[in-house]
Regions:
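Conserved strand-turn element in the central/C-terminal portion of the radical SAM core barrel
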Residues: 89-90
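Terminal accessory/targeting
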Residues: 1-50, 73, 77-81, 94-106, ...
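A broadly used, surface-exposed interaction patch
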Residues: 60-72
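Histidine-centered catalytic micro-motifs
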Residues: 52-58
């Protein structure tokens, strides 16, 4: 069994990233960026087991651009030597996938399930698709607060499990999807992207929430000698074994 921890930045501030990622500093992590971040620039240099990849927004009214070419022009300013991608809201199309392949991208984690174990596969563009097993926001929306036992009973030993945690849910220890939705809707995007550590302290949920679940998941994995990888590490292993 392998656990892969991933995170979609989704335009939050560096203060929120710092709070959200503190429990993950000793673990492999794939972070999908929506823009430049001084915090991530420094953190990736300090944590060689972290990787950053682009998280482009191809949806309508995107701040990344109004067309596929405009979005790629925006994200190429911050993705560096990227090999993987995950699109905002998992938005995709044949044209988008083919453009990623033409630009040399090798893997995607752009398919989100609801606790369904789907083995990674090579798609028609030659990209390794590594589906998501658990996403915090989706689980909160449709099921409520995740409990460790509920997640574990959907797993089996010989599989890889990709988890997607958003910094907003970790920093605020979310226990209710609608609360975060109302928070986002209550302010301009510019204000949302500047929320401070003090804002996090005031808004943080003190009951059991997503951050608590992540802590239990990590403890369970460590006690049971479950392997942690980031997505790039997993891709490299699959590439080496590909016939």
């Amino acid at each position: 069994m392998t656990f892969i921890l991933t995170s979609d930045v989704d335009f939050v501030s560096d203060d929120f990233l710092d709070i959200a990622y503190r429990p993950l500093k000793e673990l492999p992590l794939t972070i999908f960026m929506t823009g430049r971040s001084e915090y991530l620039d420094k953190a990736v240099c300090e944590n060689t087991w972290w990787e950053t990849e682009p998280h482009p927004n191809f949806c309508a009214q995107s701040t990344h651009g109004g067309s596929i070419s405009e979005v790629f022009s925006t994200i190429e300013q911050f993705y560096g030597d990227a090999v993987g991608f995950r699109c905002h809201k998992y938005y995709s199309s044949n044209d988008i996938e083919e453009e990623f392949a033409n630009r040399g991208f090798s893997y995607a984690s752009n398919i989100c399930t609801d606790l369904v174990s789907i083995a990674p596969f090579w798609d028609r563009c030659g990209i390794l698709q590594i589906p998501i097993f658990f996403e915090d926001g989706g689980y909160l929306k449709y099921h409520g607060v995740p409990g460790l036992d509920d997640i574990l009973k959907r797993m089996h030993r010989d599989a890889v499990y990709v988890f997607n945690f958003h910094p907003i849910h970790l920093a605020l220890n979310s226990c209710d999807f609608s609360t975060i939705r109302r928070l986002k809707d209550s302010m301009l995007a510019t204000r949302y992207s500047m929320l401070s550590a003090e804002d996090a302290r005031m808004l943080r949920n003190n009951a059991y929430g997503v951050a608590d679940f992540l802590g239990e998941l990590i403890s369970y994995a460590n006690k049971n000698n479950i392997e942690f990888l980031n997505l790039k590490q997993y891709y490299e292993k699959q590439k080496a074994n590909r016939i």
